[in-house]
From Swiss-Prot:
Subcellular localization, as worded in the UniProt entry: Virion; Host nucleus
Keywords recorded for this protein, A-Z: Capsid protein, Helical capsid protein, Host nucleus, Host-virus interaction, Ribonucleoprotein, RNA-binding, Viral nucleoprotein, Viral penetration into host nucleus, Virion, Virus entry into host cell
Native source organism of the sequence: Influenza A virus (strain A/Swine/Italy/141/1981 H1N1)
InterPro entries assigned: Flu_NP
Extent of motif Unconventional nuclear localization signal: 1-18
Name the record gives this protein: Nucleoprotein
GO biological process: symbiont entry into host cell; viral penetration into host nucleus
PTM characteristics: Late in virus-infected cells, may be cleaved from a 56-kDa protein to a 53-kDa protein by a cellular caspase. This cleavage might be a marker for the onset of apoptosis in infected cells or have a specific function in virus host interaction.
Length: 498
């Protein structure tokens, strides 16, 4: 972990802990994972799901969403104060899929939120276990990142759709805390700030009064989070300027867009964690695995080992390719939506194809789809090697990158060159000086122009055999740099809609 001075590791953020040593961190993360697993087993019992049905990823997602909804206090309060027809604010539910006479059927279930909170607390030693909830949110966020593109959202805030590699965590709820902030990409936070500034421009009272004071605190906090992700002094200084602005307006929006673009080359530090579906943890707990005793890490070999021997199923639509569905879920499990496909492919030991070539839609199934026509297949979530997840953007250099996505955000700490199309990125900076022209801008552009191909993005780290649990023998893969490395290249993914 880089600079462990004042920074808490993201395991600590994840578990809300104070500073702990490695063993304590592994134990508290293990406790969190075990709690999710115990909760899942109990829910499967309550819903009378068979073993096979409990391993269905669609059922896992429904159960996960129910517990998130049960603990969403803000929304629960809102629903109680603004009752809408046909919606019981005290209940939550979703589709559960059962196998009846060789066919899949959908059953819509409704549950008391209170009851679900009880089951969750019981599984977590009577505590609210917010860390476990955040963990589930990050898994959903990683799944969204791999499934959808955010072109519309990018365009609405004045950013360029080719900046999609900066949008990790863009669907995470506000309440996801420090662990959520750690996994958000530079573009995601820039976009949240731009939305705030736009509201302030349109609504004169946005920054005024008691509410305005709270808004201002939130604005400055978010600026600091974004500042902390940048690795160069000039980018950080520019964030100070945005934060200290008396009355944030268009100049700040331009500065934020400029900074987000600069992150395509001067990459920010964004954490990556392997968050798996609840059913995977449930299976492990059911087979007698004691997560708290064994300890667990979201950024090491543990999630890879867990996926090596977990069998998870998924419903597959008639014209979908099961191998492609597996790739989608594998990428989501390892938070690898914006990783270089060549690196992902090497680790997975299977070719990983760009989003546009996948014959699969998202994992979740809409209520108007005919489930009876669907089959279920085993998801192939195993890997050939494992690698440590990174929380840095790596150093930067030139390679050919693609038209659709013009940069990557590395997930795995593996020595390689990072591809980006300097000409394309730099072209985005020409003739846009609505924001302040400053020494900082000039300095940032100079650094971007001088980024050299020789700078390896990760020195000395490689991938490891699955038998090498202590990461003693790194294998440094060699990549064919002429291949396409971007996942969203020439893309036709669906848009993310709430």
């Amino acid at each position: 972990m880089a600079s462990q001075g004042t920074k808490r590791s993201y395991e600590q953020m994840e578990t809300g802990g104070e500073r702990q040593d490695a063993t304590e961190i592994r134990a508290s993360v293990g406790r969190m994972i075990g709690g999710i697993g115990r909760f899942y087993i109990q829910m499967c019992t309550e819903l009378k799901l068979s073993d096979y049905e409990g391993r269905l990823i669609q059922n896992s997602i429904t159960i996960e969403r129910m517990v998130l909804s049960a603990f969403d206090e803000r929304r629960n309060k809102y629903l109680e104060e603004h009752p809408s027809a046909g919606k019981d604010p005290k209940k939550t539910g979703g589709p559960i899929y059962r196998r009846i006479d060789g066919k899949w059927t959908r059953e819509l279930i409704l549950y008391d939120k209170e009851e679900i909170r009880r089951v969750w607390r019981q599984a977590n030693n009577g505590e609210d276990a917010t860390a476990g909830l955040t963990h589930i949110m990050i898994w959903h966020s990683n799944l969204n990142d791999a499934t959808y593109q955010r072109t519309r959202a990018l365009v609405r805030t004045g950013m360029d759709p080719r900046m999609c590699s900066l949008m990790q965590g863009s669907t995470l709820p506000r309440r996801s805390g420090a662990a959520g902030a750690a996994v958000k990409g530079v573009g995601t936070i820039a976009m949240e700030l731009i939305r705030m500034i736009k509201r302030g421009i349109n609504d004169r009272n946005f920054w005024r009064g008691e509410n305005g004071r709270r808004t201002r605190i939130a604005y400055e906090r978010m600026c600091n989070i974004l500042k902390g992700k940048f690795q160069t002094a000039a980018q950080r200084a520019m964030m100070d300027q945005v934060r200290e602005s008396r009355n944030p307006g268009n100049a700040e929006i331009e500065d934020l867009i400029f900074l987000a673009r600069s992150a395509l080359i001067l990459r920010g530090s964004v954490a990556h964690k392997s968050c798996l579906p609840a059913c995977v943890y449930g299976l492990a707990v059911a087979s007698g695995h004691d997560f708290e005793r064994e300890g667990y890490s979201l950024v090491g070999i543990d999630p890879f080992k867990l996926l090596q021997n977990s069998q998870v199923f998924s419903l597959i639509r008639p014209n979908e390719n099961p191998a492609h569905k597996s790739q989608l879920v594998w990428m989501a499990c390892h938070s690898a939506a914006f990783e270089d496909l060549r690196v992902s492919g090497f680790i997975r030991g299977k070719k990983v194809v760009p989003r546009g070539k996948l014959s699969t839609r998202g994992v979740q199934i809409a209520s108007n789809e005919n489930v009876e026509a669907m089959d279920s297949n085993t998801l192939e979530l195993r890997s050939r090697y494992w690698a440590i997840r990174t929380r840095s953007g790596g150093n930067t250099n030139q390679q050919r990158a693609s038209a659709g996505q013009i940069s990557v955000q590395p997930t795995f700490s593996v020595q390689r060159n990072l591809p980006f199309e300097r000409a394309t990125v730099m072209a985005a900076f020409i003739g846009n000086n609505e924001g302040r022209t400053s020494d900082m801008r000039t300095e940032i552009i100079r650094m971007m122009e001088s980024a050299k191909p020789e700078d390896l993005s990760f020195q000395g780290r490689g991938v490891f055999e699955l038998s090498d649990e202590k990461a003693t023998n790194p294998i440094v893969p060699s990549f064919d740099m002429n291949n396409e490395g971007s996942y969203f290249f020439g893309d036709n993914a669906e848009e993310y809609d709430n």
